């Protein structure tokens, strides 16, 4: 399960039906891989529950990432799960990629030891506040330029805004050709389908590093392109 922080579609599941996943895993004898790299970037507390927190018989393997909360260049994640399964993963890594960068592993290890749990959570709070400010700036720009052209929900976590373009059945050409010509970098929704060739009316916008002025200009240009396409 990887929802990229877009928990607006997960609210009901988190509140009422998250137990269904582990229950189905027990009933039909399968494992759950919970891919949740944006978990620590939730904008409200208490944080949403995880499948791992509900696991009672070792069926959940959870993946997290330091790349989203420390530095994107680190490219290091970590697994949490039952020891027999993690041991098999370790054996696989030893005969494939060997391991991630030793230097970056040492950096993270030393940093976490120096911070401790309290220091780590204080860092998370600062990161979340940064992304909350970025999200709010993007929502202002979206409301200004896309209000009558698209639909979206305020993201509850992460660094992306998931936008549905009204009247456009497939955003591939709009984003990968016309938007690029206007120096607007977005990702067409089809990239997130199981079959990426299937049409999608969605677009993903990142608010990780853009300034409010850049967001405003990008959505103005996107609005003009949408109007031309309709």
Report each predicted region and the residues it spans.
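PLP-dependent class I/II
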Residues: 1-230
